[in-house]
Amino acid sequence: MKQELIERFTRYVKIDTQSNEDSHTVPTTPGQIEFGKLLVEELKEIGLTEVTMDDNGYVMATLPANTDKDVPVIGFLAHLDTATDFTGKNVKPQIHENFDGNAITLNEELNVVLTPEQFPELPSYKGHTIITTDGTTLLGADDKAGLTEIMVAMNYLIHNPQIKHGKIRVAFTPDEEIGRGPAHFDVEAFGASFAYTMDGGPLGGLEYESFNAAGAKLTFNGTNTHPGTAKNKMRNATKLAMEFNSYLPVEEAPEYTEGYEGFYHLLSLNGDVEQSKAYYIIRDFDRENFEARKHNVENIVKQMQEKYGRDAVVLEMNDQYYNMLEKIEPVREIVDIAYEAMKSLNIEPNIHPIRGGTDGSQLSYMGLPTPNIFTGGENYHGKFEYVSVDVMEKAVQVIIEIARRFEEQA
């Protein structure tokens, strides 16, 4: 199993599947189509049935039941795309067997070193086989680790028919990293009662609470004149953006928050005297606090419009997804079975809120309750990203055990 995980994963991450927020196609990049087509062929080779890829790049497949029991149809999902935060082109995965727990020089020429000082969890992987980047790209373990684990688990179940299970549906979705993963997902066609995303992090992660999320695009319009004669004439759009940001609570930002604390995050800012554009994300677990944060943004905009004119600040704000807890609680047994599956494999479940979102956040509100399970990755979205193959193997075992337990309890 370990070699299959390494072979598939290192092959998959070499395919550039970064999504693109500025694209209006579905999926947003051709690499995701290329990857989806490859997976269709490999799912067929494994022996899955009803393997499809629709015009929007969604891949679905079925592992038929091998029991006569009336078992609910369960699904396992992962996403095709990788993050946009750092380049994902020409990924060169580096395999470190029997890792010694010390610093790893990822790139000597660029002096990129993965150190325990910067990443304290690193020594806990001593003795593991870990896969890192070469220091010039992200790795793409988010979410090609989860995708690989689903492929390997399905292959294992097919070759081990003594493990009884109900019908299992598999889906690989595009554009999760830019919040569009479920946008064209056909829940009815998928046909599962509930599902699990394999899109978590370290060993034991079991998540069924996510942020409530919104995005706010702000356009600041200024008036540019010659600086030598600008008195009482110039309105500097960049300074308007700075002023807006100054009204937000300094301590309510990602770098100062954890656990159940929400935040405002300035994701990008660009422009000049004439016009500047800022993009914020707004996050909170509590729906009431979430709404209050959005109202705060609206109130700041209103105050600035009263001060500088209505055209000075233009706000576009949209909800992106909601806390899935509300939809998971009524079917709590799906969390309990995952919890029991981990315990039976001597994995200590680590239940904590997702300080982010998964496809499951939106799918849960579309009628498909979908908690999230660990994959073994660390330091996602950057050059220090790595994954433990040993933990990936545990994730595969969890998938298998969840399927087995649903059949056993039917």
From Swiss-Prot:
Entry's transmembrane regions: none
Note accompanying the cofactor annotation: Binds 2 Zn(2+) ions per subunit.
Record flagged with keyword Protease: yes
Alphabetic keyword roster: Aminopeptidase, Cytoplasm, Hydrolase, Metal-binding, Metalloprotease, Protease, Zinc
Gene3D superfamilies, per the entry: 3.30.70.360, Zn peptidases
UniProt xrefs under Pfam families: M20_dimer, Peptidase_M20
GO cellular component, one term: cytosol
Residue sites binding Zn(2+) 2 per the record: D142, E177, H381
Chief localisation class: cytoplasm
Catalysed reactions listed for this entry: Release of the N-terminal residue from a tripeptide
Cofactor needs: Zn(2+)
Active site: D81, E176
Compartment(s): Cytoplasm
Family the entry assigns: Belongs to the peptidase M20B family.
Function: Cleaves the N-terminal amino acid of tripeptides.
HAMAP family xrefs: Aminopeptidase_M20
Protein's name according to its UniProt entry: Peptidase T
Gene behind the chain: pepT
